[in-house]
């Protein structure tokens, strides 16, 4: 298994290692959460802690299939902990498989000298009553598939002579799922792997978890969202589309199904914001897919829809860097991404190529009604700097690889 140090995440997790807070890592299936647990173990060992102090359980491993309830898990841990002297470290992978897991975790936290790390593939892992039960005694870290920079760390050794442009083309179709490095990013095996991953997410994290009976409807909705990443649409417009396919579905049902997909981290919803009225708009959100390589594997057409895929890539990079993101509207103009991190704003427009005066005017003109002094970017595949009027133009590769934006 090829592993890289995911320092962006470790930097955020490191201050909480050894504290009483429960460390929770969430994200789409197979995005690298288990590897994060291994990286944390490595750091603990390097700090002088013996691996004999570790208790690790992967709840998708058949060896632990008997641990299906909070009581059985609690009994197992207390039995194993009795054999360990001093503080011990708990690593639970895919804990959502255990019924009422939060009761066990909270009991372990308050009654034993332990440091707890858990992963899960569902955004609702810590929602509502679960969060209340844990009493805010946790910190959550969302883990994403590889960024372009992380992809390069593993792809460069495989194709050392390829120019950066070719590397980016490979990323456009392969995406950032970590395991692809183990099959050397070869096209056919990668596509097969990603298709299998998609099926696992759909079956285990969406259908099974939410007890969905109409799988055909779910598949149609997923196909529609995948085809329309980065475009605004409403549940009503999707209901009309399905009606044309002889499926009559209430908009509320559609919204529920899309929410289940977002809970499984297959999609991310981006709300629209009226920048003049400073309010979130109630309809016509955009959706992006967790990994554009999955889109290529199950739907195809990433190069055909390259403008949408570039948007998808930039959006995920903004999330990785901890920005809160909305789509901005000012009058009749729309800004792809309005980004906020601790009160510091950033605006980003994404285009394929600035190949005509009309395109240049549209992309740069999106900022005409924005009067503040926060950084404004237009990002595209163009190689030459076309910055103007205080608006910065960046090649998308340079933008993605920059350590910081200012």
Can you say where each PLM-predicted feature lies in the sequence?
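Pre-Walker A adenine-sensing motif
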Residues: 4-18
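Hydrophobic anchor at the beta1->P-loop junction of P-loop NTPases
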Residues: 25
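Conserved lysine of the Walker
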Residues: 33
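Hydrophobic positions on the alpha1 helix immediately C-terminal to the Walker A/P-loop
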Residues: 36, 40
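Short glycine-rich substrate-engagement loop in P-loop NTPases that contacts/grips substrate
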Residues: 56-86
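Interdomain motor-coupling "hinge/lid" segment immediately C-terminal to the ATP-binding subdomain
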Residues: 123, 128-232, 265
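Accessory nucleic acid-recognition modules appended to NTPase machines
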Residues: 185-345
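Catalytic cores of nucleic-acid endonucleases
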Residues: 328, 352-397
